[in-house]
Amino acid sequence: MSASTQQEPSLILITGMSGAGRRATAAALEELGWYVADNLPPELIVRMVELSFSDDSPIEKLAIVTDVRSRDFAGNLTSVLHDLHTGGRRPTVLYLDATDEALIARFDAVRRTHPLQQKGTLQDGIDREREMLTSIRERADIVLDTTNRSIHDLRRELEKFFAAADHSSVRINVQSFGFKHGPPKDIDMLLDARFLPNPYWDPELRPFKGIDAPVSDFVLSQPGAQAFLDHIVGLIHSVLPGYRKEGKFFVSVAIGCTGGHHRSVAIVEELTRRLADDGVLVNLSHRDLER
């Protein structure tokens, strides 16, 4: 990728599944100081960007929300991305997603029909939209699954990505999780800490979690734990230059154990400390710690 088309940290294109939280995302970004243009058809995006970043415009950070209600949405948006790249801008594409069950529950709660439902069922509309958006999801820089996220959770995630003072480096989002709850969907790397002994089976350690010293000390002292961390840190450092060259500035790493309470939590805490000590921009979260 040439220098003229590096990722533009001041420009976000927000799209994704209807009901996945586009409006909540727009509101959160406004609170973070972004100028948000909502429900903009793809054919108007390039012009909006040109006007917003003209010399006499006061706008410094622009987020544009667009959805499938426009005709040939995926094709038009792909064309827009090409035109923006040609013009020297590479926006961060944020794709919001959720499970079918979560989307159906949200539509039922507000008693709304899906924009692509037509005369069919709500599921028909969701299926149609997923098919239409497949290519856009594949091109997204960030895929954010909102299934189990409250509005407050969503805002915290957006803060991690878009409220940082330094947007010139790759930001690593590290999270722990429990495999019994399913792996996260919005990740770039997935690692398994279940090869380590489980503190759950020690009656003295069972009341504690991976953020507590007794469990953390136990996990990190196990054979293989330090080598595991060394390999992860080395892997991340080895791929950062490539991600930066490709204009990918947000990378999600997930480390799992059985329940997401002990081993993965301790490993993620230590990994975050090591990366931060190395000067890497890193965020930390524990998805299943309170389950």
Swiss-Prot record:
ATP binds at residues 16-23. Keywords: ATP-binding, GTP-binding, Nucleotide-binding. GTP binds at residues 67-70. Belongs to the RapZ-like family. GO terms for molecular function: ATP binding; GTP binding. The keyword GTP-binding applies. It comes from the Bacteria. Displays ATPase and GTPase activities. HAMAP family: RapZ_like. InterPro entries: P-loop_NTPase (IPR027417), RapZ-like (IPR005337), RapZ-like_N (IPR053930), RapZ_C (IPR053931). The keyword GTP-binding applies. This is Nucleotide-binding protein jk1004.
